[in-house]
Amino acid sequence: MTIRSSPFLIIAAGALCRLLDAQTSPAADAPVVITVEAQNSTLYRGDTFDLSKIAKDPGPTTSVNTAFITVFNVGDIRTVNGETVKGIWSSPAQALPFHANPQPGQPIADVDSTGMLQCIWQILTSDGKYIGTLIDNGAAAPGPHHIVTGGDGAFLGMTGVHGAMQFATPERAASTSEDPANRRTLGGGTLRTTFYLFPRSRPNVIATPGGPAVTHADGKLVSAASPVAAGEVLTLYATGLGPTTPFVEIGQAFPQGLAYPVNAPVDIKINGQSSEVLYAGGYAGSVDGYQVNFRVPAGIPVGTGSLQLTAAWIPGAPVTIATK
């Protein structure tokens, strides 16, 4: 891993972002599509009123949906867009099984609905580094979507929707008398859902008067007079790649003296081919500035190439680089 001194990263807070004006972001109405899969999904119904019995039964237990009972769903996030991750899906809710034609004990309403709930999706890398959190609110019916109301980490300020929970195997309904430490042993449902997200910001390659901030190993800017070759190791400078380890607070500059590798998966495609990302991390002294070292893939055509940077499954605006 090599961290280079760059004239393209301005140290003063906020100055870095002003270099992005020359770029065109993806269309505002083009959502980022993310599919999340989870396992061991269990619904715990708050039907245990003797406090001495809560979370004591080794299980498995069962429960029945009843009006006004508090419920809590939990599952283990296992993939995002097919990529292995870790994480927790949790969802507290108040059970209100609304019905247009209710049976005794069921609340009446104009539509059949399960009532409102909130979902929290905390996503980590496969080795446990924090990527980000998505928060949504919604109901199983009648609307087709849950509304994404915010996020943190790589998903800071995110809005959007996600569709219905699709269960490949049914969620297990349990009682709050059951010991939740045994959830994985007892098993549960397998689910997937697809998010359609509108990011507050995207990963972007910094724009300079001479073109995108992509340089050769000697620090020289890639240009028509100095094109890139297949297999060459390049460095690009960017914003919006999300949290790092160690963590740096929002709005604070990356300190000197340490490497700050990005937590989220980072991908660079040239004409649709993935490059080998050698290092992606915060750039010392910059606010939201990052350096990415990568190897150009084989088989790129001579002339120009379209380079697209993606972080946390969020694509940035493509930029054009000269190739040979």
Q: Where do the protein language model's features map onto the residues?
A:
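Beta-strand-enriched cores of mature, soluble protein domains
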Residues: 23-202
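Positively charged n-region of N-terminal signal peptides that target proteins for export
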Residues: 1-5
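Bacterial N-terminal signal peptides
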Residues: 7-21
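Preference for short coil/turn "hinge" residues that link or interrupt alpha-helices
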Residues: 9-13, 148, 221, 293
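A sequence-level detector for low-complexity, Ser/Thr- and acidic-rich stretches
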Residues: 24-26, 33, 44-47, 51-53, ...
